[in-house]
Curated annotation (Swiss-Prot), chain B:
Substrate-specific adapter of a BCR (BTB-CUL3-RBX1) E3 ubiquitin ligase complex involved in various processes, such as translation homeostasis and lipid synthesis. The BCR(KLHL25) ubiquitin ligase complex acts by mediating ubiquitination of hypophosphorylated EIF4EBP1 (4E-BP1): ubiquitination and subsequent degradation of hypophosphorylated EIF4EBP1 (4E-BP1) probably serves as a homeostatic mechanism to maintain translation and prevent eIF4E inhibition when eIF4E levels are low. The BCR(KLHL25) complex does not target EIF4EBP1 (4E-BP1) when it is hyperphosphorylated or associated with eIF4E. Keywords: Kelch repeat, Repeat, Translation regulation, Ubl conjugation pathway. It comes from Rattus norvegicus. One of its GO terms (cellular component) is Cul3-RING ubiquitin ligase complex. It holds the Pfam family BACK. The keyword Hydrolase does not apply. This is Kelch-like protein 25.
Amino acid sequence: MSVSVHENRKSRASSGSINIYLFHKSSYADSVLTHLNLLRQQRLFTDVLLHAGNRTFPCHRAVLAACSRYFEAMFSGGLKESQDSEVNFDNSIHPEVLELLLDYAYSSRVIINEENAESLLEAGDMLEFQDIRDACAEFLEKNLHPTNCLGMLLLSDAHQCTKLYELSWRMCLSNFQTIRKNEDFLQLPQDMVVQLLSSEELETEDERLVYESAMNWISYDLKKRYCYLPELLQTVRLALLPAIYLMENVAMEELITKQRKSKEIVEEAIRCKLKILQNDGVVTSLCARPRKTGHALFLLGGQTFMCDKLYLVDQKAKEIIPKADIPSPRKEFSACAIGCKVYITGGRGSENGVSKDVWVYDTLHEEWSKAAPMLVARFGHGSAELKHCLYVVGGHTAATGCLPASPSVSLKQVEQYDPTTNKWTMVAPLREGVSNAAVVSAKLKLFAFGGTSVSHDKLPKVQCYDQCENRWTVPATCPQPWRYTAAAVLGNQIFIMGGDTEFSACSAYKFNSETYQWTKVGDVTAKRMSCHAVASGNKLYVVGGYFGIQRCKTLDCYDPTLDVWNSITTVPYSLIPTAFVSTWKHLPS
Amino acid sequence: MSVSVHETRKSRSSTGSMNISVFHKASHPDCVLAHLNTLRKHCMFTDVTLWAGDRAFPCHRAVLAASSRYFEAMFSHGLRESRDDTVNFQDNLHPEVLELLLDFAYSSRIVINEENAESLLEAGDMLQFHDVRDAAAEFLEKNLSPSNCLGMMVLSDAHQCRRLYEFSCRMSLVHFETVRQSEDFNSLSRDTLLDLISRDELETEDERVVFEAILQWVKHDLEQRKVHLPLLLRNVRLALLPSDCLKKAVSGEALLMADECTKLIIDEAFRCKTKILLNDGVVTSPFARPRKAGHTLLILGGQTFMCDKIYQVDHKAKEIIPKADLPSPRKEFSASAIGCKVYVTGGRGSENGVSKDVWVYDTVHEEWSKAAPMLIARFGHGSAELENCLYVVGGHTSLAGIFPASPSVSLKQVEKYDPGDNKWTMVAPMRDGVSNAAVVSAKLKLFVFGGTSIHRDMVSKVQCFDPSDNRWTIKAECPQPWRYTAAAVLGSQIFIMGGDTEYTAASAYRFDCETNQWTRIGDMTAKRMSCHAVASGNKLYVVGGYFGTQRCKTLDCYDPTSDTWNCITSVPYSLIPTAFVSTWKHLPA
């Protein structure tokens, strides 16, 4: 076929209609790559030798450059290697690993196993085979466990594997007692140790373990690490240590006594500890703030809906243990925790009178006291802690209340209690008065979900209070009209479940308090109206409630990472829970 | 990551359970190919330059070798080009075409249009890009037309595109009268021309068209081509030329008389023609064999089921014209054609007596004569021509027959008539006696489909007679039990349609007599029991039949290439077809 013949065909064809056919052979690229691999195996047209260890791999520059930016840059720049016909990795890459990478480059397939996954991830990142690096990270994610999670944390941090890093980090927090004994722990960089030990989510009930881990890390390389001691000491919740341990072991530690700043930190912690022991006001110092697993869960309830007793949930033994009687039994009250104290507000007593009373139970000293009464007598209201103050929201009142209100109509009034001054103050009222709403605080704001409105309907609104502006807004609508629901907070996520709704009473949702977005989560295991929920550690706990004539008999736990509910224990037959709170936990002094 | 670290990981992992993941990135080959294309466009890592015309194309040897065996061989095995860094196609390849091929090699995609398809086919074949060659062939198949089919035939023959060759050859045959006038015709090779003119399927009713075409071809390059004249003439159906045309050839065409071989051929053809004109025995010379388009379709029928007239189908005018009366009207007879004669055998006359008579109608001389009577009087039998002899198969007889047989029971007997000596001979009987069966000959064998058995059931067997063995075998089962069906033959394919069957009487099937395989084809436009079919040209024709009380009023045509049925014409109201034959056609002498 000559050039002139083709020109004739062009001129002839042009007189006809335009007829075009795009031919694409989807298997063509696979075929070319397979052929290139055969050429490589036969050492045909290869123009570069890669050396690793004592092995040599002949390759095609163009193919390597097409697969990896590392090689493209190496061969195309003014670098020495761009001219050389050999590249030597010496001992920085194992020949078995390089072989796997090259097999992948020429076949698009690679076998990843426990022996090679970490090395492949490193080499894949180094040579910019990002697909390999990501595939190995995924493999390691599926094979993550407490004995290797610390190593994976270091590996993923070094190679920008975000998801593997997140999963490893979470597993390290959950398995602190295991990883602290790991040799890798002692080799962690300083910033990572600080981040780990200071985390709220670090799962330990014995703060002594955290102190000892910090001291071990310092001692491992005392010469270089001694200067970091003050920073590490601040990660330990020193005021939560047993008093004797704090006085004798920590205060007397030679490494601490010889360093002025560390000594000051310990002395501050001792003063804080004494304040706790003497019950002298509210202790809000960071060194006394328990980690999430240091929370104690308390149920309030009784044999009827009249609440007369306080119970402790023993998570280890999976038991519910009576702790104290309530001085003044009541129903339709609200309960909230600040620090290690439980505040019980309002409700109705044995003669159905609406109460202004506020009782306070000190979980540390196991004793009751009375706080200043509320400004408005309430029942069916909600309450939450915000910046160490107690807020009481909505509910019903009676004609005898101090402020004017219609009998049995949902209140708009919101009042604030400051424990340090033992005083109540009115703050901005709700946009819409509600009772039987779910009230929580998250990210320095109060949220009220649903409830019963002044016209006795179920309200489908989310109402939000900003303390800085002293103002309520309505930033979102609930997925459905709601009342008698339960809510609890994990980070910026508010979980709402159960309740009286047009949909199933076992449905549960997640609300992002920053984006105001709703997400459905897994259903509660039973239908629960008037149930109660708290968050502790990285989990949610729900108890109580009923549906029809059936009482819900279990205490259930929800794990957000798995989106599953499990039963923790059975509620005693004689107990009807009417409130559920989480307080700071302290070890016996 | 060092070698020792990897070794440590291997030994550590081995203690655990074996856990393997095969990572496969399906898009990796496409990514690599796209990157290679980018490298090519930037002239990076290129190690060979292809030249075509005045354009240069830098490429990667490895990629070209992986894409094409032509380049793999060129660059390997010590050839000169294996060391040169340039390859020059000069004017053998148009640069636009080479560019398209290289784009395909590096992207798996190519745009094919009317301007480039032929050149791509040629270059794709030359450089062994067979996918491109095949894709271009497919494009050309879809754009085949009478004005280009001859050129495509030449092109596809040169480049082993078998399917395009078949399609273009078929189109050239169907449109011979058009293609012989094209410029390409004179450029055909001798073998290609022979292939065309030797085929029965060449569609012309006037053999002078073929005769003049080959003279034209020879004269186009007289010195080189006159040596081929004898062979070409042997493939023209010279005896079908009008007598005056033959005489003119003898006296007027100097070219034909100049060569002794050619003269002999003309003389032989003339003697054959004379024999036909004098009606001196059966003429079976290839010179007298009509092309399929030269067949005459004849319908036998009458105003009732008693047949008393022969009609001719005029294709051009789409009419059915009476031609002659039958000397002895009859029903339940059978009719077959040998050459230009129609043989009417057996049946029952006006007094229901079963007949042995054989009447012969000569379509050239338009006259009846009587042949020797059959050995057995029959009705409801089948007949077919095989190797210029007439075979009569099965049917019913009566006690008056020469051979013993039960009254009205289906016959096994088969007898053969040789027109050469005007004698009947018994041949091997069928395995199962049948009547009302479809009987045809194909590939030198007789085939009998279904029929009524001696138990009066419908038969579902295909029985086959091989005259060289004088033996019947059962080749296959019919798709369903059958009788009163029609059958016709195209090449090795036997088409069977209609009839009395458990399924629809409109169904039609194709049987491959070489592989014994059945295939369902498109249904007829009407249900037809006792219909009749013939093949002519590349098409099937069916006429007659009834369903319930409804007569089928049309003559329909089936085109196997499009698997569709169409109506040709209506059968006159006064005509009930009872037989349908196809004879050789001769022009008026």
